[in-house]
Structures are given as structure tokens and as C-alpha cells.
Amino acid sequence: MILSSRLRLALIKLLAAMVVMVCAPAQAMADSPVEQRFAAIVIDAQTGETLYARHADARRYPASLTKVMTLYLAFDALDAGRVKSADPVVISRRAAARPPSRLGLRAGERLSMREAMDVLVVKSANDVATALAEHLAGNEAAFARAMTAKAKSLGLEHTRFLNASGLPQAGHFSTARDLALLGRAFLRDHPDDYTIFDQEQTVFRGRLIQGHNRLLSRPGIDGFKTGFVNASGYNLLTSGVRDGRRVIAVVLGGRSARSRDAFMAKLVQASFSSLAIRSAGFELTVADLMAQPAAPLSYASVASDEVASRPVIQAALTQAEPTTAQGDASPPSRLWVQVGAFRSKARGQARLADVVKRHPRRFGSGRGT
């Protein structure tokens, strides 16, 4: 695309006004606990290209991001006909004894496969993760071996699973890059089922369960999972789509859920901006558009590890999302709502009917039922 010099200059000024680099503190913090746990990556979901990376190949505790693989294998089993969504999953004594977060069912109680999977996403219930693993593989250790084998087959070379929940266990690890690749594999292999991650809440036997993923209320962001254990810090795997371009992002080791979410929102926004720059025919890094650095975030360093000739995300927007004008009580425009992409029309219609119930804040329907 050929642009006049005036138009190019105007576009550069516009982008410079929108984008601000998140700079690292002047003092190196390589030995700090924060830096030892922090890792992040953004990839283009279509091409697999790395847009941003920081400590992306360093071993980290995945915490409840582990449950994305648990659900991947559950959907594999459903697709193969080995189990059905209505099949009962029994809570064993071992499952009932798992530490929080948990649903709290007693040993011997049951829930359906579909209920278990929904609760696994929204509640991040460790007791349900163990019960689901036992239902699918006989015991959790066997299921964990299947998880690791699947990881290797998907190209996750630096991942080892020892349980289905992500509770801390020596030798249970992954990397930011591997978790992003897992997200990409889920989108590719289970596209109709990805919408399970786009739930702000669920109802289990009349009990409303609120989720932990606050980014789901943001336009364009449509799924995946939060995670936390003391050893890992606050983790998040997310994905979003804008103008037909989807990115997958992972942030590990946040100091708090709030700082993790703020960093992720800015990182995703910056990724979309970088892709827009490319589509306009520019070979500019976000740093080229910067005038003044922003105040540091709660991470020791966010400079990119990747060196390439094409633009690499090295920044985040000052404001992750535009705010609604004060006094405007109307809900956001429905134009931005993406229900999903489905191979089956019937599944798409079923999902559409379920959206309002799962996202009451988006549709102004209160607590929902």
C-alpha cells in the first residue's frame, strides 16, 4: 500500500498519541523474587509468530493454567465418544480432600461431566479437577502422564504435568511459550468448545458461582484461564480478537490479580496496535512511536527478549480500553460481542441462547440465573 508522506506522518502521530512504552526501572532487578517468577509472551494465533516475549522459555509454575490441558483432554474424550457430557463424575475421598479452591462436594457425591467442566473453568475447583482426571483415566497419576504425553505431541517441549489441577508439586512445570502454544492448540483442535472459557459465572444446583477472570468483560477478550498458587504468583492465559486478528497472551508471576490484569490488558492492546501498524505498511516498533516513558508497572522488566527485523511488541497503551462517557448508563454496543465460531449451526444457536445468562454485566441483566 502506497501512502502519501503527509498521510504517513499523520498516521505516525496518531499512533504515537495512542501508544506509550512500558519501561523497566533503571535499577536492574534480575535477582528479585518478582523477576524470578515473571514471564510473558504474546503470539499471533493464526501464524504462531511471537510478538512479544520475556523469559518465555523459563520454567515456571503454571498453577491453574494446568486446567486448560485437563479440559483439552476432556474434550478429546468427548469427541472420541469415550465419555458423554451427561456421564456422572464421582467425587472420591482423595478428590474431596484437595485443598482450595474447591467446589466442596463430599466423597461419593456426583456431578455431570459438563457440570464438572464448567465448574473447572469458573471456580477453578481442585477437587473437581482430580475427580475429572480419575473419571477419564482411572487415577490422577495416569491422567497426568496422558497430559504430559499430549503436551509433547503438541510441541510443548518444556512442560511436565504431575496433577490435573496445578497445585504445587515438585517437577510440575511449564513455560509461558508452552502455555501460549497450548492455547493455540485448543483453539485449533476444539474451536467449538473454546467458548467454555468465556464464562464470567456459572450456576451449579441453584448456586451462583462467580469467576475470577475479570478481563472477560473487556471488548474483544473472549476466554481462557487465571491461575494462582504462592509459588507461581498470579498467572493468566488469555486470547482476544480484533479486526479479524487473534492474539494469545500469557502473563506469569504477577504480584496481584489487579497488577496482572492491568499488565495483560495493556499488552493485548499493544499487540493489536502493533498488528494495525503492520497492516498500514509500516515497519516500526512501538518504541519508535514513543515520546515519554510511562511509570513502571509491578514487574521488574518488560523489554522484549526477541530480536527481529519485524516489529516486536515492546510497549503497552496508557489506557487499555476507552471508558464510557460519564452519565451514560446504557450498556456497551452489541456490535462488539462475538459469540464464537462454530462448525455446527445448532451449537452456535445453543451458545447464543446461553450468552446472556453467563454474562449478565455485559447485557445489564443483573445477577442472572
Whereabouts are the PLM-identified features?
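N-terminal secretory signal peptides that target proteins for export/translocation
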Residues: 1-9
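Short aromatic/hydrophobic contact patches that present stacked aromatics
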Residues: 59, 248, 336-338
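Local beta-strand/beta-hairpin segments that build beta-sheet-rich folds
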Residues: 51, 289, 339-340
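Extracytoplasmic
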Residues: 177-333, 343-369
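Bacterial N-terminal signal peptides
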Residues: 12-24
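Active-site-adjacent loops and short helices of periplasmic peptidoglycan-processing enzymes
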Residues: 28-177, 187
